[in-house]
C-alpha cells in the first residue's frame, strides 16, 4: 500500500469512463511508489470488504510483465479505496474489431499469440483474470503492444497450484465457463474457456449458445442443474483456427488445453513457420495426453522413482521402491518377476518402457495391486498376459498383444494400442475415451465402433479409396485425425472424403490444410502444408 493520503485537489477529472472510473490529470505531480506520471486512470471503490484493493495487489504481482497494464499505487481511508492505474494511449480490441472487421487471419494469429503469451505469463505467476473480453484488451500506441487491462475480477493464488480456491461466480454473460456455472472452482483453465470466447468475438461472432452435455448428462432446469452452454464457432474461420478454439472448449476443465500448449498450436505457426507444424501438432497431442490424462490431477513432484536397467533375474520384492512413490518407471529392459508388496499402494502411474518398447512379460496378478488406485499404465510389445482390471484407469498404453483389449475399464480417457485390432471395438466398454491411438490397425472404419467422445484419433492404414470413404463413419466428436494410406490412394483423396468435423488432419506424416470451400472435388495433395 502507498503512504499517500488521497486529496481531491491533487487530481483533475478529464473524463468519466464508467461509474467510479475516471481519466485524471496529476495536478500536483504526486509520485506513487517511485512512479511519476501526468495522467492515469483513477478507480474509486467504496469499501465493503477487506479485498477492495485486490486489483492493486494483483497488478503489483504482475508489474514485470510489459503486456499488462501497470498500477502506480493505491491508498485507502475508512470508507474508500483509490487505485491509480496506467493510462494507455490507444484503443480497445473491441474498437479495433468493429473498425477493421473482418480481420485477416494472419493478423488475428499475431494478436492471439500476443494475448495467449500474456495469459501464460500471468498464469505462471499465479493469477487468473476471469474477465477476458474485447474491451479489456488495449493496444498501447507508445509501446506498440496489446495489453491486458481491468483486473478487478482477477484472483491470485500460489503458482504451484493447478487452480485456486475461488468459488465466486463472476464474469461477463456468454463468457462464463461450465465449471463456474456449476458452482465449481475457478482456475487457469477457466481463463482458457473465456479466451476461446474472446477469439470468437474477434472473428465478429456472437456468443450464441448451444446446449452441451457433461459426462453424458444434460444439465437443464428440469434436473435442478444450471444450463451449460458452449459457444458456436463462426463457420468462416479456417479449420486451423477452428481447432485452436475447440481446444479452449473441452467441457471438463482438466482436459482443456493450457496456455503453454496453446502457444504451440499450429494455427499460430501457419503464417510464419509452416515447416515445424507436424512437430508442433505431435508434441501438442503428447503433452495434452500426458498432462490431462496420464497425470490427470496427480501430484508427482519428488514422488517419482525410476528403476534402471539391470540383469537381475531375482524376483522384484518389497522395499526396493520407496514408500510414497506415486510415479514408478521401469526402463525398457526390466523383466523381473513382481511379487506382492513390491508395488507401494501409493503408486498411481506405472510405466514399463515407453509406448510399446519394453521387455517386460511377467504375469501381473491381482494380488500385486490390491491397495493400488492405478490411474495410468504403460506396457510394451513383449507383454502377452491377460491385463488385470483397474477400475480407475484413465490412461492405458499397450503393445501389440492381440488379447490386451480385454478388461478395459469405463474410466479410460486415453487408449494407445500398438497391435492390430482383430475384432470391432466395444464402445460401451470405453465410453469416455478422448484419445484413441491404434496406429497399426489396417482395417476400414466401421460405423459405431469409435466412441462418440473421441477428440483425437490416430488410425493405421486405409488401404484403398473404398476404405477412405469409411471416414464418413467417424463420430462428429473427432476434431484431430491421423492415418496413412498408399501414395496412389493419397493422390485420389478429395475434400469431400473428410468429415466436416475434422479441423486438423495428418496423412502419411503430411499436415493438410482443409480449406473451407464449396469445392468438394479439391484434392488434398494440393493443400499440403508440410
UniProtKB/Swiss-Prot annotation:
Keywords: ATP-binding, Kinase, Magnesium, Metal-binding, Nucleotide-binding, Repeat, Serine/threonine-protein kinase, Transferase. Its cofactor is Mg(2+). The keyword Repeat applies. One of its GO terms (molecular function) is protein serine/threonine kinase activity. It catalyses: L-seryl-[protein] + ATP = O-phospho-L-seryl-[protein] + ADP + H(+); L-threonyl-[protein] + ATP = O-phospho-L-threonyl-[protein] + ADP + H(+). Belongs to the protein kinase superfamily. STE Ser/Thr protein kinase family. This is Probable serine/threonine-protein kinase fnkB. It comes from Dictyostelium discoideum. The lineage of its organism: Eukaryota, Amoebozoa, Evosea, Eumycetozoa, Dictyostelia.
Amino acid at each position: 500500500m502507498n503512504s499517500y493520503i488521497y486529496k481531491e485537489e491533487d487530481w483533475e477529472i478529464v473524463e468519466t469512463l464508467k461509474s467510479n472510473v475516471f481519466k485524471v490529470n496529476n495536478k500536483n505531480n504526486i509520485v506513487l511508489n517511485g512512479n511519476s506520471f501526468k495522467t492515469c486512470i483513477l478507480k474509486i471503490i467504496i469499501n465493503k470488504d477487506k479485498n477492495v484493493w485486490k486489483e492493486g495487489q494483483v497488478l503489483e504481482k504482475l508489474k514485470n510483465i510489459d503486456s499488462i497494464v501497470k498500477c502506480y499505487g493505491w491508498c485507502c481511508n475508512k470508507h474508500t479505496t483509490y487505485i491509480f492505474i496506467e493510462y494507455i494511449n490507444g484503443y480497445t480490441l473491441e474498437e479495433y474489431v468493429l473498425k477493421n472487421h473482418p480481420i485477416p487471419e494472419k493478423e488475428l494469429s499475431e494478436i492471439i499469440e500476443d494475448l495467449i503469451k500474456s495469459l501464460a505469463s500471468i498464469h505462471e505467476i499465479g493469477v487468473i483474470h476471469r474477465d477476458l473480453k474485447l474491451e479489456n484488451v488495449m493496444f498501447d500506441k507508445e509501446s506498440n503492444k496489446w495489453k491486458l487491462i481491468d483486473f478487478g475480477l482477477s484472483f491470485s493464488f500460489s503458482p504451484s497450484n493447478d487452480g485456486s480456491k475461488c468459488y465466486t461466480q463472476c464474469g461477463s454473460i456468454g463468457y462464463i465457463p461450465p465449471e463456474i456455472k456449476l458452482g465449481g472452482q475457478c482456475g487457469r483453465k477457466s481463463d482458457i474457456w473465456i479466451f476461446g470466447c474472446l477469439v470468437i468475438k474477434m472473428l465478429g461472432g456472437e456468443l450464441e449458445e448451444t446446449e452441451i452435455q457433461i459426462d453424458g448428462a444434460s444439465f437443464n432446469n428440469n434436473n435442478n442443474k444450471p444450463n451449460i452452454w458452449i459457444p458456436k464457432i463462426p463457420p468462416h474461420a479456417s479449420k486451423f483456427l477452428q481447432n485452436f478454439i475447440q481446444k479452449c472448449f473441452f467441457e471438463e476443465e482438466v482436459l482443456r488445453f493450457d496456455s503453454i500448449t496453446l502457444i504451440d498450436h499450429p494455427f499460430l505457426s501457419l503464417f510464419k513457420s509452416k515447416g515445424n507444424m507436424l512437430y508442433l501438432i505431435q508434441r501438442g497431442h503428447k503433452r495434452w495426453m500426458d498432462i490431462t490424462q496420464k497425470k490427470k490431477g496427480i501430484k508427482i513432484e519428488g514422488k517419482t522413482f525410476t528403476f534402471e536397467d539391470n540383469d537381475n533375474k531375482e524376483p522384484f520384492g518389497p522395499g526396493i521402491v520407496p514408500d510414497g512413490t506415486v510415479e514408478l518407471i521401469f526402463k525398457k529392459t526390466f523383466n523381473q518377476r513382481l511379487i506382492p508388496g513390491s508395488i507401494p499402494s501409493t503408486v498411481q502411474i506405472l510405466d514399463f518402457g515407453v509406448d510399446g518398447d519394453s521387455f517386460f512379460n511377467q504375469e501381473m496378478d491381482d494380488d500385486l495391486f490390491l491397495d493400488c488406485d492405478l490411474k495410468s499404465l504403460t506396457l510394451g510389445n513383449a507383454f502377452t498376459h491377460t491385463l488385470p482390471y483397474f477400475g480407475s484407469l484413465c490412461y492405458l498404453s499397450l503393445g501389440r498383444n492381440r488379447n490386451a483389449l480385454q478388461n478395459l475399464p469405463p474410466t479410460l480417457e486415453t487408449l494407445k494400442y500398438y497391435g492390430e485390432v482383430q475384432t470391432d471395438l466395444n464402445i460401451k466398454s470405453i465410453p469416455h475415451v478422448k484419445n484413441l491411438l491404434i496406429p497399426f490397425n489396417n482395417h476400414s472404419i466401421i460405423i459405431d465402433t469409435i466412441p462418440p467422445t473421441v477428440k483425437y484419433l490416430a488410425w493405421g492404414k486405409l488401404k484403398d479409396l473404398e476404405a477412405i470413404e469409411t471416414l464418413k463413419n467417424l463420430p462428429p466428436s473427432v476434431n484431430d485425425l491421423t492415418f496413412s494410406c498408399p501414395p496412389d490412394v493419397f493422390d485420389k483423396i478429395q475434400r469431400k472424403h473428410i468429415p466436416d468435423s475434422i479441423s486438423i488432419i495428418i496423412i502419411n506424416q503430411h499436415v493438410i490444410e482443409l480449406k473451407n470451400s464449396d469445392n468438394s472435388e479439391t484434392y488434398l495433395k494440393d493443400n499440403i502444408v508440410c
